[in-house]
Swiss-Prot record:
Organism expressing this protein natively: Mus musculus (Mouse)
Family assignment from sequence similarity: Belongs to the cortexin family.
GO CC terms, sorted: membrane
Record's subcellular location: Membrane
Protein name per the record: Cortexin-2
InterPro entries: Cortexin (IPR020066)
Amino acid sequence: MSSTYCGNSSAKMSVHEVSESSLSLEQKTGFAFVGILCIFLGLLIIRCFKILLDPYSSMPSSTWEDEVEEFDKGTFEYALA
């Protein structure tokens, strides 16, 4: 008699578990937010590795030489202090 009762209650529980196992709106929103954060983190990691592998590709070609020429001309006032 108890085995029949357990089998009967497990059938009822499986019907209720299916309806309760669906995610609520808050859980769906949370999983979507975590997924977006994981994608963003992955993109940042890829960008950082690209910069580490070739750090000078992201720099403009005329930076240091132009500033040195301006420094030699005396355009920087604080250089005298």
